[in-house]
């Protein structure tokens, strides 16, 4: 009868509901024999129900078994159900049922086999929290664990990063009558290596013989791979030699580990030699390279820019059907894109299709990422079109790349349109995508739009995270709303992203408190952003309090947080405070970074502590920290201000020897210093070097011109201004009016007139006041004709519009001693001066007759495409 029921159930495996009805009918029979038969068939029906995922029926089966009066059969049936659950990877159901069985039948000991089965299922399903209870229950039952049991327990502890506890359990094995086998050692060695304790893993390997167990190839490979990951290639080579001494032949896993490590270290040529040897296996007895080996080498060549070698290798992969894979194509695509070979990359996409290896979404996204990072957005849009034609729908990553590209070039409106297109195409944006746009809106000061986006993100359930909150905090700090930012950070600790409701009335109810899952807690970036804002505003006391709060939240400050204080203290000349922070920073194990040194050099420079600057730069060299353009420029600036011009020049030479390209500011300080000495020949030499390196930047010319003018070098200043006019530079930062006035005072009217004629002939619009000294001078000399000509020109210029090349008042501040004593740039001030000048009075009368009483200006000069404007790139 029992066999008949089992057969009937198995016959209806594909119809589980019918099988269940058959089982229930037999079980419900009043006959005790039928009742017992159905219990014996429990494992069969349980397997059918589990496979069909009939969870309600499984629970009903459990209740039916518990209601049975046949105790012995009832227990075995319950345990069989537990066993089936465990074997079917349903530990969440097996474990509570097992606990129930143990509470109902405490005197009956389950088998060690069942415990092992449950432990194995816990590990497979990553439910290690059940492991401890199971082991304790075994001990309470007095069941002796097997070596296999210990192997499972040690593995569970290692997977939970409890390698020390795993070692303690390993050491207990002899006391429990269990001898570790090669699997025990392999599990624990892997645990040590995973925890970064490779040397302890090696110690265990060396101790294996004392336990009567010989190391196998797997354990050696584990150690070799770990040494390789840590960059300890010499140690890995020693292990390979030791393998050979033990009679173990290194296999493909060993060699792939070595090649992978060498490529990661950039030693691709060394890896290539091993690869070449492997290809000659029939002579050297080495394993043949497999697809993993080829891909590792391809990635290595691409990483270091050996594209020709990579291309040759890829061609050999492409021609071999056993090696060619989507992964190989994607590696080659990534290599081409990383080095800007976009045309070749598009060719590879076509080759993939021809080869029958359809490009995946990842393949297209590699191209999208590269194009968008370089701002090649129209090309990126073309790729999106190609994807759609080939039946591949753009995903969140595709749109994210394009969105980031638009935001990077300030095309926020295009990014917003893209977000809408994304939603129309049923591609839901994630928090990362929205955060990109949110950051750009805040950065551009489009706060109301940022608020609207934030509200929509919440409505759509995109999950506001810490990154979102950090963007808002950064935006508020940048817009000077520090107090609001502080309020939000305080709220984040309590309410998570609901703290954004503190932004104002428009945010009330923005986030539902009931949905908070602590996914928006302030992190180091949050605190660092706020610390920077407070220090920038000079609110150091509040910054210190916030720093203490951060540590109270168990967030250990990193060098970035300390550097914020150091930088702002140095900037304010509080060098002692900066060094106190530095001392505390180093006590906490945070090392000085390039940013730290740059801040300290700035602070020491402000305090004119030149000797200490040299000391810091020497320390950087000792620690292998390379100075950058900021380091050199700051040091050069303060060396020049401290009259250490020779030292500053040496630094400039060192900078160029290290292939760090100087910028305008690198030369600015030296030019100013040499003019101050004065040593105009050296200043001229530095200027010429600057032009050859930085190009024809008008900032360099205006600097040199203004310095020559301030030093009274009128002839050299005139020559330079004429060169400037020939190059078509704008004159906004050139003190040309001062030059004209100085020339007139030196009775160099002809030279001054020549400059003005040249400016007029070249179509320059300039301050009409520049004409007044020449008009006055010509009038006094009796040259009325030319004086009247200039006066007419002045009136013509005054009637046109705004002055295009009006002298920048900031440029004048550094040369107050050369200013017109009557002050001001407005030519009307000169017309109103009472110096007896008839020309001035006549010009004034013309203005009163209808030439205009407002701001006097002139026309724009023709715009020249090749102009290289001076950008603040220091």
From Swiss-Prot:
Keywords of this entry: Repeat
Matching InterPro entries: Pentatricopeptide_rpt (IPR002885), TPR-like_helical_dom_sf (IPR011990)
PPR repeat residues: 111-145, 146-180, 181-215, 216-250, 251-285, 290-320, 325-359, 360-394, 395-429, 430-464, 465-499, 523-557, 558-592, 593-627, 628-662, 663-693, 697-731, 732-766, 767-797
Pfam families found in the cross-reference section: PPR, PPR_1, PPR_2
Keyword Cell division: no
Presence of keyword Hydrolase: no
Transmembrane segments: none
Similarity remark: Belongs to the PPR family. P subfamily.
Name used for this protein in its record: Pentatricopeptide repeat-containing protein At2g17140
Organism: Arabidopsis thaliana
High-level lineage: Eukaryota, Viridiplantae, Streptophyta, Embryophyta, Tracheophyta
């Amino acid at each position: 009868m029992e066999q008949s029921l089992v057969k009937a159930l198995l016959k209806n495996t594909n119809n589980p509901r019918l099988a269940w009805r058959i089982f229930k009918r037999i079980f419900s029979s009043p006959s005790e024999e039928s009742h017992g038969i159905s219990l014996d068939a429990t494992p069969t029906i349980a397997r059918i129900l589990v496979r069909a995922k009939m969870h309600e029926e499984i629970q009903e089966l459990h209740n039916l078994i518990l209601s049975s009066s046949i105790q012995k059969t009832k227990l075995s049936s319950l345990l069989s159900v537990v066993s089936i659950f465990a074997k079917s990877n349903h530990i969440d159901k097996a474990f509570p049922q097992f606990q129930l069985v143990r509470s109902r039948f405490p005197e009956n000991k389950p088998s060690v086999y069942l415990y092992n089965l449950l432990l194995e299922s816990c590990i497979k399903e990553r439910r290690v929290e059940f492991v401890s209870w199971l082991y304790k229950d075994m001990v309470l039952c007095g069941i002796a664990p097997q070596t296999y049991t210990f192997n499972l327990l040690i593995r569970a502890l290692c997977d939970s990063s409890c390698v020390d506890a795993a070692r303690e359990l390993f050491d207990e094995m002899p006391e429990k009558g269990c001898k570790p086998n090669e699997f025990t050692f392999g599990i624990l060695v892997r645990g040590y290596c995973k925890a970064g304790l490779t040397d302890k893993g090696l110690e265990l390997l060396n101790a294996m013989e004392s336990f009567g167990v010989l190391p196998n190839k797997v354990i050696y490979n584990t150690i070799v791979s770990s040494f390789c990951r840590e960059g300890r290639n010499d140690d890995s080579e020693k292990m390979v030699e030791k393998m050979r001494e033990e009679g173990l032949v290194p296999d493909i896993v060993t060699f792939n580990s070595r090649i992978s490590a060498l490529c990661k270290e950039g030693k691709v040529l060394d890896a290539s030699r091993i690869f070449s040897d492997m290809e000659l296996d029939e002579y050297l007895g080495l394993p043949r390279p497999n697809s993993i080996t080829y891909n590792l080498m391809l990635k290595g060549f691409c990483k270091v820019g050996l594209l020709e070698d990579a291309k040759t290798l890829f061609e050999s992969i492409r021609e071999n059907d056993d090696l060619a894979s989507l992964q190989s194509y994607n590696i080659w695509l990534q290599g081409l894109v990383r080095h800007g070979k976009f045309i070749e990359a598009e060719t590879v996409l076509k080759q993939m299709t021809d080869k029958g290896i359809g490009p995946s979404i990842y393949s297209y996204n590699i191209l999208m990422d590269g194009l968008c990072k370089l701002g090649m957005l129209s090309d990126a849009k073309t790729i999106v079109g190609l994807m759609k034609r080939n039946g591949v729908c753009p995903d969140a990553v595709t749109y994210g790349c394009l969105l980031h590209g638009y935001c990077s070039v300030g095309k926020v409106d295009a990014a917003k349109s893209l977000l809408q297109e994304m939603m129309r195409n049923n591609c839901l944006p994630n928090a990362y995508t929205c955060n990109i746009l949110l950051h750009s809106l805040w950065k551009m000061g489009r706060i109301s739009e940022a608020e609207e986006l934030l509200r929509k993100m919440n409505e759509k359930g995109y999950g506001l995270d810490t990154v979102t909150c950090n963007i808002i905090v950064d935006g508020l700090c940048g817009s000077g709303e520090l107090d609001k930012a502080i309020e939000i950070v305080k709220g984040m600790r309590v309410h998570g992203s609901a703290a954004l409701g503190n932004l104002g009335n428009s945010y009330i109810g923005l986030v539902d408190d009931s949905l908070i899952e602590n996914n928006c807690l302030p992190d180091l970036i949050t605190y660092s952003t706020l610390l920077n804002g407070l220090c920038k505003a000079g609110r150091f006391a509040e910054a210190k309090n916030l720093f203490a709060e951060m540590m109270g939240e168990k967030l250990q400050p990193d060098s970035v947080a300390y550097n914020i204080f150091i930088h702002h203290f140095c900037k304010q000349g509080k060098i002692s405070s900066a060094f106190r922070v530095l001392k505390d920073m180093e006590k906490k194990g945070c090392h000085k970074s390039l940013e730290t040194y740059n801040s300290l050099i700035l602070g020491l420079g402000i305090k004119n502590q030149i000797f200490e600057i040299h000391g810091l730069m020497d320390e950087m060299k000792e620690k292998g920290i390379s100075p950058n353009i900021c380091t050199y420029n700051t040091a050069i600036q303060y060396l020049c201000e401290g009259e250490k011009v020779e030292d500053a020049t040496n630094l400039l030479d060192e900078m160029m020897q290290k292939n760090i390209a100087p910028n305008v500011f690198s030369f600015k300080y030296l030019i100013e210093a040499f003019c101050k000495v004065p040593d105009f020949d050296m200043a001229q030499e530095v200027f010429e070097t600057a032009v050859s390196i930085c190009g024809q930047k008008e900032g360099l010319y205006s600097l040199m011109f203004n310095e020559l003018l301030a030093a009274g070098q009128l002839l050299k200043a005139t020559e330079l201004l004429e060169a400037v006019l020939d190059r078509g530079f704008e004159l906004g930062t050139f003190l040309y009016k001062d030059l004209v006035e100085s020339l007139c005072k030196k009775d160099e009217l002809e030279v001054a007139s020549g400059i003005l004629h040249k400016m007029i002939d070249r179509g320059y619009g300039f301050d009409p006041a520049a004409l007044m000294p020449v008009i006055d001078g010509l009038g006094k000399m009796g040259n009325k004709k030319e004086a009247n000509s200039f006066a007419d020109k002045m009136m013509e210029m005054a009637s046109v519009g705004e002055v295009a090349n009006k002298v920048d008042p900031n440029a004048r501040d550094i040369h107050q001693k050369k200013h017109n004593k009557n002050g001001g740039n407005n030519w009307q001030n000169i017309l109103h001066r009472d110096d007896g000048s008839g020309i001035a009075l006549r010009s004034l009368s013309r203005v009163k007759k209808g030439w205009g009483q407002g701001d006097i200006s002139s026309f724009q000069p023709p715009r020249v495409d090749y102009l290289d404007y001076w950008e603040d790139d220091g």
